[in-house]
Amino acid sequence: MFLKAVVLTLSLVAITGARAEVSADQVATVVWDYFSQLSNNAKEAVEHLQQSELTQQLKSVTKGHISALRVIEKGRERNSWEHSRRVGPCEIMGRQVGIFGQPLRVATLPNCDLPVNSVPPNTHLSQAVGPYAEELRTQVNTHAEQLRNQLTSHAQRMQSALRQNVDDLHSSLTPFADELKAKIDQNVEELKGHLTPYTDELKVKIDQNVEELRRSLAPYAQDVQEKLNHQLEGLAFQMKKNAEELKAKISANAEELRQRLAPVAEDVRGKLKDNTAGLHKSLAELSSRLDQQVEEFRRNVGPYGETFNKALLQQVEELRQKLGPYAGDMEDHLSFLEKDLRDKVNSFFSTLQEKESQDTPVALPKQEQEQSAVPLES
């Protein structure tokens, strides 16, 4: 019934303001086709909104706290504006075009007022894994300092033995030199044993948080569940690959430290056959050489945690781009539809007004006007 009223109204406009060749059926067909197309665009906008929610879900992982605060603040401003005005984009559309916008407003209004809180809490994958990378730096510093203290303490014991056994340096200091080499091997192995478990814990944490991310995104990716699972599996594989590379780098640097410290112990052992002055000089330099090698190890391994975090953020951002092909949100799209609708309706009536100004309207007799008005009243 409503559509018949629209067609009848447009028919009257066409009869009274346009040329005879512009029929009411043609006008009704044009307007109805346009609203059908506009309704389809509105459905696409709703689908884009769902994709946008998925995009925002993943984007929050890569942008961190600052971006999260911006999104929250923007959402608050938008909600405040909407609640204060008590009007949404679809209602504006309906008011602009009067009765012509009513069917579209009824069809799309339920989807325009989707609550902001419908999106589940964000799963901050980087925040969950990040503490392990920071803990790695802390453990590197702690155990490197322990290694430094133990080797330095042993060097000091050798210096003390040198002062007490000037007459028989070779026999008194040889055990210390052998012990120094053994301590280097022992402490490097302990260092590896303390640091490498953190990479194994990282891999376990990765599996847990990727699964949590999968569950939280499932309601928003029902139509692309297979693609989502595939991409999340790829994300977990790349992250665990990064953890394995981190473990390999730690082991390689520990072995390199062992190789650099071994000549230091051999140098001291070789000086036992030299004079006392040369041995004193070698032992005096021993502590500083040990400190230098351990400090270089700490500087090399410490930043690996930050490198891991950066790789994690990059991989999550790549996942977000793969799963979020649609940009923009529902409100922006509906604003465009509103403007497009208003422009086309204005253009339509402007065309009628131009025709009216160019042609002299055909005056109907009063009796015919009264007769034509009777069906409207019934």
UniProtKB/Swiss-Prot annotation:
Record-linked InterPro entries: ApoA_E, Apolipoprotein_A1/A4/E
Description of how the protein assembles with itself and partners: Homodimer.
Swiss-Prot/TrEMBL domain comment: Nine of the thirteen 22-amino acid tandem repeats (each 22-mer is actually a tandem array of two, A and B, related 11-mers) occurring in this sequence are predicted to be highly alpha-helical, and many of these helices are amphipathic. They may therefore serve as lipid-binding domains with lecithin:cholesterol acyltransferase (LCAT) activating abilities.
Residues covered by region (Disordered): 354-378
Ranges occupied by Sequence repeats: 33-54, 60-81, 82-98, 110-130, 131-152, 153-174, 175-196, 197-218, 219-240, 241-262, 263-280, 281-302, 303-324
Biological source species: Canis lupus familiaris (Dog)
UniProt-annotated location(s): Secreted
Family: Belongs to the apolipoprotein A1/A4/E family.
Signal peptide span: 1-20
Function: May have a role in chylomicrons and VLDL secretion and catabolism. Required for efficient activation of lipoprotein lipase by ApoC-II; potent activator of LCAT. Apoa-IV is a major component of HDL and chylomicrons.
GO biological process: acylglycerol homeostasis; cholesterol efflux; cholesterol metabolic process; lipoprotein metabolic process; phospholipid efflux
Name of this protein: Apolipoprotein A-IV
Region (13 X 22 AA approximate tandem repeats): 33-324
